[in-house]
Amino acid sequence: MRISLALAATCLFVFTNSLAGQIRHVDDKDLAAYLAGVTERGRALYAYDQAAWHGTDAFFAIHPDTNGLTHYICMKTAAGWEVAFPKWTETHDRLLVAYEAKPAGGPENFTAVKYDPPREGPDDLVAKERALELAVGDFGTANRPYNTAILPAEDGNLYVYLYPAQTKSDVWPLGGDVRYTISPDGKQILEKRQLHKTILDFQFDPKLKTAAGFHTHVLSDVPEETDVLYVLTRKPSIPEYIGAARHVFAINTDGSIQVVKK
């Protein structure tokens, strides 16, 4: 790939820090394995995001009673991604699944069902709901819609992501996202890492025939999994170049990452 390709006109300056304010740095000897992990998590985020999109569409199509429902939670199963819509009991000691959206013949096709009476939520769903509530409460109020996602982390911990949602079908936001690492029971925040600060909404002008996008990481020297999510979601599908302190990276349209300049 050549950086001389036509690039998106606007550069995004991205600031990354952890809860302790540390700069994200990866040694060159660990870089290949780290980038493979970013790709894996980014692809999983994309799959989660797609399941949430199509699963919630199916959910709202049956005109549900949303009173008391908490967050949607996507779960990867042998049959594909499923989306649960739980709620707490009045005493907040049991989590019940009131609705569920399941795959129906393809990744974009879901069928929603209502459980009457609601089903008891398994322990892993309870932990994920607690983790979401903890992260959302810490994140606070945003001035635009946000999506959430939950992925497995090392040592049984949970990654909870909050990232800006699309508000227009042809505009893709990048930035303003946070990743929390939360204990396996969903009760303790172990790390809060802001992946990007600035939010920019990218809209492509077909007259420009843009071949790739570009943004710069100022306080991080590696791509983030939400960068991969951005590339996999954006239409038209084009690569994204990321300028960091020591390297220039290319995120390809399949989510893989390569170093294009050292």
Q: What label would you give each PLM region?
A:
Residues 17-21:
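Sec/Tat signal peptide C-region and signal peptidase I cleavage site
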Residues 1-5:
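Positively charged n-region of N-terminal signal peptides that target proteins for export
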Residues 189-203:
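A short, well-structured beta->alpha microelement
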Residues 95-111, 172-190:
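A short, surface-exposed beta-strand/turn
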Residues 22-112, 117-119, 125-156, 199-262:
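Active-site-proximal loop/helix of nucleotide/amide-processing enzymes and allied scaffolds
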Residues 140-181:
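Hydrophobic, aromatic-enriched interface-forming segments
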